[in-house]
Amino acid sequence: LRRGDIIVFSHEHQTLTKRIAYVPGDVLPDGTIVPDDSYYVLGDNRSASLDSRFWEKPFVSRRTIIAKYIF
């Protein structure tokens, strides 16, 4: 998976669709490093999206990913 990919994943008993913004090893603006096999995701509608910026556990584990959109 790469930055910019749109994924479908399970998060807190919901199925969500978001875009990968940071991949394993990337450093977030606050200095946090994205863990191995994890992703930091953002919704395309940033002003209304509940995404990694707001979750207590901000990273999406690879094992929770259900699908990747292919265009």
Residue ranges and their predicted role:
Residues L1-F71:
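Extended hydrophobic leader/signal-anchor segments used for secretion and membrane insertion
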